[in-house]
């Protein structure tokens, strides 16, 4: 039986882990990020990978920093056949990568070399890409720079957001990994080096990116809204208050009104953006309120806004 050290943290990693278990791989350990305090009550939350591991009675390691840790020494001493990572979220030292008998393999949520880094799925949406996919790759010291074992593309639908793409890609990642592992194990796999001239990076989303700017076109704003749904969410600043926008669509009409102005508030709630473009807001969350569809917003708080009023803070 082929032994695996599995490393993953978010929901994206769970189908990959469960796929390995169901396919009969021996999971020696699951390595995931430490538990975190979340919400106003600061409750301790386990990572999705840890929850899945405990369900299957697998040993779990959660080093704050893997490099130089006692946990890393434990993992090296396991002499596993494979390391498999899926959105683990930490740097893996070369010493550890080289400690396995066969290979260290990563399931990455983009078509490398496009979107190396921590937010490949979000950047495919931010940039309005029409497709994305999964890369099964060899892990090396440099981030996401290893040779490619296999790739598969999927179409990005207009209604997709980060949440739906994460779900689709985690299933695709599981399936492509399980299809590719036998040829990695028996040595017959053909590796393709990444083209260094085509490398694009996707660094983690910053707090600044969460705020929608009226210098954006409606399409750019909508792409950002999709990229930040369900977490952390994009927002406009309206009269000094955060106004989250969970879902929107680019309107078919244009407007000569100043960007940040209410274009319509009867039957729809539309705001002007750069280049005379208009965005229809479909699901919103005013500061201190729950998420609501636009009909409920217009029946309540939204009824105070009038067409032609500049409401978005610059």
UniProtKB/Swiss-Prot annotation:
One of its GO terms (cellular component) is cytosol. Gene3D superfamilies: 3.40.50.12230. Its EC number is 2.1.2.9. InterPro entries: Fmt (IPR005794), Formyl_trans_C (IPR005793), Formyl_transf_N (IPR002376), Formyl_transf_N_sf (IPR036477), Formyl_transferase-like_C_sf (IPR011034), GART_AS (IPR001555), Met-tRNA-FMT_C (IPR044135), Met-tRNA-FMT_N (IPR041711). Keywords: Protein biosynthesis, Transferase. It catalyses: L-methionyl-tRNA(fMet) + (6R)-10-formyltetrahydrofolate = N-formyl-L-methionyl-tRNA(fMet) + (6S)-5,6,7,8-tetrahydrofolate + H(+). One of its GO terms (molecular function) is methionyl-tRNA formyltransferase activity. It comes from the Bacteria. (6S)-5,6,7,8-tetrahydrofolate binds at residues 110-113. Belongs to the Fmt family. Attaches a formyl group to the free amino group of methionyl-tRNA(fMet). The formyl group appears to play a dual role in the initiator identity of N-formylmethionyl-tRNA by promoting its recognition by IF2 and preventing the misappropriation of this tRNA by the elongation apparatus. This is Methionyl-tRNA formyltransferase. It comes from Lactobacillus acidophilus (strain ATCC 700396 / NCK56 / N2 / NCFM). The gene is fmt.
């Amino acid at each position: 039986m082929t032994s695996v050290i599995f490393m993953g943290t978010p929901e994206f990693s769970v189908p990959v882990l469960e796929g390995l278990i169901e396919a009969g791989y021996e999971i020696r350990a699951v390595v995931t990020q430490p538990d975190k305090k979340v919400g106003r009550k600061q409750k301790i939350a386990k990572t999705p990978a840890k929850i899945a591991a405990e369900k299957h009675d697998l040993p779990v390691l959660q080093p704050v920093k893997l490099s130089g840790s006692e946990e890393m020494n434990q993992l090296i001493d396991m002499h596993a056949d494979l390391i498999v990572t899926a959105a683990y979220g930490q740097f893996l030292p070369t010493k550890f990568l080289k400690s396995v008998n066969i290979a260290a393999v990563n399931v990455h949520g983009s078509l490398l070399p496009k979107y190396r880094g921590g937010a490949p799925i979000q950047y495919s949406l931010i940039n309005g890409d029409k497709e994305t996919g999964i890369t099964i790759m060899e892990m090396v010291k440099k981030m996401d720079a290893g040779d490619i074992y296999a790739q598969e593309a999927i179409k990005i639908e207009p209604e997709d957001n980060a949440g739906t793409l994460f779900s689709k890609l985690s299933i695709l990642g599981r399936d492509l990994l399980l299809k590719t592992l036998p040829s990695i194990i028996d040595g017959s796999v053909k590796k393709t080096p990444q083209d260094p001239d085509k490398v694009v990076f996707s660094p983690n989303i910053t707090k600044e990116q969460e705020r929608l700017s009226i210098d954006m076109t409606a399409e750019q704003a909508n792409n950002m809204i999709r990229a930040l749904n369900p977490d952390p969410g994009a927002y406009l600043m309206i009269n000094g208050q955060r106004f989250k926008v969970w879902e929107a669509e680019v309107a078919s009409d244009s407007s000569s009104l100043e960007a940040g102005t209410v274009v319509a508030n009867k039957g729809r709630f539309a705001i002007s953006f750069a280049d005379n473009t208009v965005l229809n807001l479909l699901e919103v969350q005013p500061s201190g309120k729950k998420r609501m569809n636009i009909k409920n917003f217009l029946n309540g708080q939204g009824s105070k806004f009038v067409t032609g009023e500049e409401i978005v803070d610059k």
